Structure formats: structure tokens, C-alpha cells
């Protein structure tokens, strides 16, 4: 997260605290309400279900071998985890939007074995390519960071995007192509079928219906 954004959050927290009577308790917290992107993940090759507990800054790990999710482990991660992806049966990457980090979690022992710093407001991560790379969308800087999972200390490659707030990521079945959903793409498209406005090839707004 940029210094400016962090300053805004700090001022907001201080202003909220100043309006309260008495002292703020030690367990006070601020709900940033970060948007979930990929909060659930079934781990291939295991009986584990992963879930991001955004408000409590934890990765919740469940065992589903009985057909019903049973709590197995709860791992503290960064602030506001919004996405989780399993790299394999023993490792998961958790995207922490407010912390601007990736928590690499050991699923067998239930701890964060490495923390990666990212650009502002990371949103999602996906593994693709040969050799394998980890692609991380950063909505605050409109870019994708490309990490080498085999060497997390190496500097990431940066891919700049045209569009604002890239979020969810997906890949082709063969893993050779990565797709990014952009919240504000600016390409004149919409999911609403409102018809054209005055023949200028712009979808009419605001008809919130499908024609």
C-alpha cells in the first residue's frame, strides 16, 4: 500500500477513536471491508479446504474427508486476506490486501514460512507457466507482479496493465495463458444489456436490466 493510502487509513482510525468516550480497549479493530476475490480453495491431492478469514486476519484450514468441513488449523496471516491459492498439496499463498503482502503457508505444519512484499493492494494470485511462476495482481498500482516460487528472494518481474484495479486471475487449461479481470477497464463494456444510446455505440446507462 502506498504511503498516501496508509496515511488515509491511519487518519480514519484516529478520527474514529477520537469520537469514542473513554479509552480504546486493546482488542479494538477496524473492519476495512476489503472485497473477497478468491476466498475459498479446495486443495488438490488432499482433503483440505482453505478459507480466508478476512476480518480476523487468518487462514482457516478444514478437513473435508468426512464430507463435512471440520476445523483443522487456523493460521495468522496479514491484514485482510482476500484470496488464497494452493500451489500444491502442502503449500498455499494468501493475498493480504491491506498488509500489501503474500503469506506463504505450510499446510502440513500450519505456519507462515515466508512473507513476500508486494505493490499496493494485492488482489489475487495464480500459478502458471513452465517453469512455474506466481502471478499477483495489484489493484493499487495497476500491475501484475511475477514471482519465482522456487526462489522467492528473487526480484519479481513487473507487467503494467491498461485499466484500473486488476483483481481476479485465471489461467488457460494448459497453463500457458493468464487472464486478469479488471474492475475499471475503461473499454466501454458492461454486463448490463441496456441497449445502445443514440447510435454512438455506447451502452445506455443506467438501465439496470437485461433487454
Give the ranges of each region predicted by the language model.
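Predominantly soluble domains enriched in secretory-pathway, periplasmic, or organellar proteins
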Residues: 22-211
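Bacterial N-terminal signal peptides
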Residues: 8-19
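Bacterial N-terminal signal peptides that target proteins for export
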Residues: 1-9
Amino acid at each position: 500500500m502506498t504511503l498516501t493510502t496508509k496515511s488515509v487509513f491511519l487518519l480514519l482510525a484516529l478520527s474514529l477513536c477520537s469520537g469514542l468516550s473513554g479509552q480504546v480497549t486493546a482488542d479494538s479493530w477496524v473492519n476495512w471491508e476489503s472485497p473477497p476475490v478468491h476466498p475459498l480453495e479446495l486443495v488438490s491431492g488432499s482433503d483440505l479446504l482453505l478459507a480466508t478469514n478476512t476480518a480476523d486476519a487468518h487462514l482457516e484450514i478444514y478437513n473435508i474427508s468426512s464430507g463435512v468441513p471440520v476445523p483443522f488449523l487456523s493460521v495468522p496471516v496479514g491484514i485482510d486476506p482476500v484470496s488464497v491459492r494452493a500451489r500444491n498439496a502442502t503449500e498455499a499463498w494468501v493475498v493480504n490486501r491491506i498488509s500489501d503482502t503474500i503469506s506463504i503457508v505450510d499446510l502440513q505444519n500450519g505456519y507462515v514460512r515466508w512473507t513476500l512484499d508486494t505493490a499496493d493492494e494485492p488482489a489475487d494470485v495464480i500459478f502458471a507457466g513452465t517453469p512455474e511462476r506466481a502471478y499477483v495482481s495489484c489493484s493499487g498500482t495497476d500491475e501484475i507482479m511475477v514471482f519465482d516460487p522456487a526462489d522467492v528472494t528473487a526480484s519479481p518481474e513487473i507487467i503494467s496493465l491498461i485499466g484500473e484495479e486488476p483483481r481476479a486471475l485465471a489461467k488457460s487449461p494448459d497453463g500457458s495463458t493468464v487472464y486478469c479481470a479488471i474492475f475499471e477497464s475503461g473499454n466501454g463494456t458492461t454486463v448490463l444489456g441496456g441497449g445502445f444510446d443514440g447510435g454512438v455505440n455506447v451502452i445506455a446507462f443506467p438501465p439496470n436490466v437485461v433487454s
